């Protein structure tokens, strides 16, 4: 499990040469940058020690929900496609990442008043992917709560919405 903050990393110049931030991605651009760097890296080392204090403000851009958050779906989809082409042996992990990202965004939609209605097209995209998820294949890699909620979406999306207070 690698933290996605670029500010927690040191890279050799040759590893990140040619990798640029995608200016079209408004949130999760650092996750994509790290992913591309790891795809190029010959090896990496995780040194689990805190040497940096990080403060998150309540008014931070990453606290407020808006359409930028849907960029996380595009990043997860891109990562999956790149893994399929370049490192198929990691496909299961890319699929799990994609499902977790979509699930997390679904929860964000329900936590923000009127977001499900306001972003109905994106909501449908999220639900469609989660309904197709092969839960038994990934059940040991996700939490029991996530498993049960995705299962409920597969069985009865209206019941899921009612339980979440939006149906």
Where are the regions that the model predicts?
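Donor-binding/catalytic cores of nucleotide-activated saccharide
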Residues: 1-44, 55-65, 69
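Membrane-interface aromatic/basic loop that binds lipid-linked glycans or pyrophosphate carriers
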Residues: 111-167
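GST superfamily/GST-like fold recognition
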Residues: 99-102
């Amino acid at each position: 499990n690698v933290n996605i903050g670029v500010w927690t990393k040191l890279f050799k110049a040759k590893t990140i040469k040619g990798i640029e931030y995608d200016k079209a991605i408004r949130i999760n651009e650092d996750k994509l940058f790290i992913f591309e760097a790891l795809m190029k890296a010959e090896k990496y080392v995780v040194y689990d020690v805190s040497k940096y204090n990080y403060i998150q403000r309540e008014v931070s851009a990453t606290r407020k929900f808006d359409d930028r958050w849907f960029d996380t779906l595009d990043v997860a989809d891109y990562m999956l496609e790149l893994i399929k082409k370049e490192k198929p042996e990691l496909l299961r992990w890319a699929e799990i990442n994609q499902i977790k990202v979509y699930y997390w965004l679904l929860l964000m939609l329900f936590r923000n008043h009127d977001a499900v209605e306001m972003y109905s097209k994106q909501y449908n995209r999220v639900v469609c992917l989660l309904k197709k998820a092969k839960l038994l294949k990934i059940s040991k890699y996700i939490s029991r709560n996530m498993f049960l909620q995705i299962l409920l979406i597969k069985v009865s999306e209206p019941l899921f919405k009612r339980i979440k207070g939006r149906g």
